[in-house]
Amino acid sequence: MSRLEQRFAELKAEGRSALVTFVTAGDPGYDASLQILKGLPAAGADVIELGMPFTDPMADGVAIQLATLRALEAGQTLAKTLQMVREFRVDNHTTPIVLMGYYNPIHRFGVEKFVAEAKQAGVDGLIIVDLPPEHDAELATPAQAAGIDFIRLTTPTTDDARLPRVLERSSGFVYYVSVAGVTGAGSATTEHVTEAIARLRRHTDLPISVGFGIRTPEQAANIARLADGVVVGSALVDKIAQATSADQAVNDVLSLCSALAEGVRGARR
């Protein structure tokens, strides 16, 4: 059983949803980013998505584009992102880490080398937003062969004809993007999310995490009553953008994470 499978199974037994937090590796700088990463589990994050900075983040909204820019300007590379996971794993062997980003940096790094180093570092899953199922052989197949889950995005525009193809080789969990568009845009209604989850459950037994547009503990709680996981990214990244120092960035991100965790954990009581 993978770390992701284990975590979702534990939370299902507890009768609650997972808080899945997204931050960009290297934002606002390596040391502060590592502090945030190490602090998230104690602040209530059940699963961590760690963004791999890339110069052309086309699926991301302004908040995450700016986070990517800050990280790249601070010298973040894919090699440093993998090193960050290694350092995280020195003290934490239970919290799943999913790397999220685009295929280009991995392709340049070398797929075989990347998969081997990601596995060795302690990466549990990958979300590659610009690599559709038709290109499974390029990364999904070698990653899963190494024991790294490959997580697919589904959206309101993924119809019933397309869904089986998207979900066919998915593992870990399914990430439902509740609003069509870039990250951080709007938020979906409870009715919409309820219908979408019911539709996905007809096609897969994997846990379903819902993201995009969730910013407050109240919104997180609403989704936590419906989904197996609640993904929050832009709201956390905004705290880094608004901070006037690295220490403030760390404190503000972890404070918001704690508030979100409280919302998620109290949702089904």
From Swiss-Prot:
Annotated CDD domains: Tryptophan_synthase_alpha
Keywords: Amino-acid biosynthesis, Aromatic amino acid biosynthesis, Lyase, Tryptophan biosynthesis
UniProt catalytic activity: (1S,2R)-1-C-(indol-3-yl)glycerol 3-phosphate + L-serine = D-glyceraldehyde 3-phosphate + L-tryptophan + H2O
Disulfide bonds: none
InterPro entries: Aldolase_TIM, RibuloseP-bd_barrel, Trp_synthase_alpha_AS, Trp_synthase_suA
Database matches in Pfam families: Trp_syntA
A molecular function GO annotation: tryptophan synthase activity
E.C. designation(s): 4.2.1.20
Pathway(s) it belongs to: Amino-acid biosynthesis; L-tryptophan biosynthesis; L-tryptophan from chorismate: step 5/5
A Gene Ontology cellular-component term: cytosol
Role summary: The alpha subunit is responsible for the aldol cleavage of indoleglycerol phosphate to indole and glyceraldehyde 3-phosphate.
HAMAP family: Trp_synth_alpha (MF_00131)
Similarity comment: family membership: Belongs to the TrpA family.
Protein name: Tryptophan synthase alpha chain
Gene: trpA
